[in-house]
């Protein structure tokens, strides 16, 4: 069941306990960021807040974010992640610099490939609000295994976000604790570099085909062999 929380003016967090989505309500339309797992009834949760027409934009194409797309049929998603989406969905491109205005928010699209090749963040510079999808988290785990992920790109994207950190006040990840501060960008980066350099001990995940790496701040599910 999705729990809906009004976090700021016109800004709602829709959370099923495993992943969260974000709904912004304006005067004439609403904006939904991500759609959750398949079968989560995200449309019902949105309709409980507003009856406005809804546009959908995506932080990335993983199943736990794109699973509710059939309830809407259309979204904006970075082209690099189109192959992750199945079903009869009308996909429109999403790229660096695309801006979405709704309900007093101005969300700028920032490409941050790594967690997936098509990962993006949405950033409201005036409010200092960053919606990074899965790419910035407190503790983790951050998934970095599989053919649609790239650790080198993830590291470069974290560096890109670090350049914005002075203006960021609030980060709301799609998983685990929220809100968090901009210091977690640097913490995730520090541990990602350590993982790349082979400095983190790893243990086999008991259920998934990956290795669990635990850094100083962040846990990653990555490639490689257990140490």
Report each predicted region and the residues it spans:
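Conserved SAM-binding loop
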Residues: 112
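A short alpha/beta connector and helix-capping loop motif
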Residues: 143-158
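Accessory terminal helices/loops
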Residues: 159-227
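Conserved beta-strand hairpin/beta-sheet module of binuclear metal-dependent hydrolase folds
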Residues: 1-48, 121-133
């Amino acid at each position: 069941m999705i729990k809906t929380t009004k976090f700021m003016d016109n800004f709602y967090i829709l959370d099923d306990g495993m992943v969260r989505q974000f709904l912004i309500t304006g005067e004439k339309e609403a904006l939904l960021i991500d759609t959750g797992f398949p079968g989560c009834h995200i449309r019902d949760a949105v309709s409980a807040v507003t009856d406005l027409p809804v546009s959908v934009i995506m932080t990335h194409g993983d199943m736990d974010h794109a699973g509710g797309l059939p309830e809407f049929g259309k979204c904006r998603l970075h082209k690099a992640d189109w192959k992750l989406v199945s079903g009869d969905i009308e996909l429109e491109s999403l790229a660096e610099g695309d801006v979405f205005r709704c309900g007093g928010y101005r969300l700028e699209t920032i490409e941050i490939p790594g967690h997936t090749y098509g990962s993006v963040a949405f950033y409201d510079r005036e409010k200092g609000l960053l919606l990074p999808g899965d790419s910035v988290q407190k503790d983790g785990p951050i998934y970095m295994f599989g053919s649609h992920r790239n650790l080198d790109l993830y590291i470069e994207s974290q560096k890109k976000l670090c350049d914005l950190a002075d203006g960021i006040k609030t980060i709301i990840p799609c998983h685990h604790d929220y809100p968090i501060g901009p210091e977690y960008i640097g913490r995730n980066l520090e541990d990602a570099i350590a993982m790349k350099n082979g400095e983190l001990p790893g243990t086999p995940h008991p259920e998934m085909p990956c290795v669990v790496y635990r850094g100083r701040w962040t846990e990653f599910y990555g490639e490689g062999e257990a140490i």
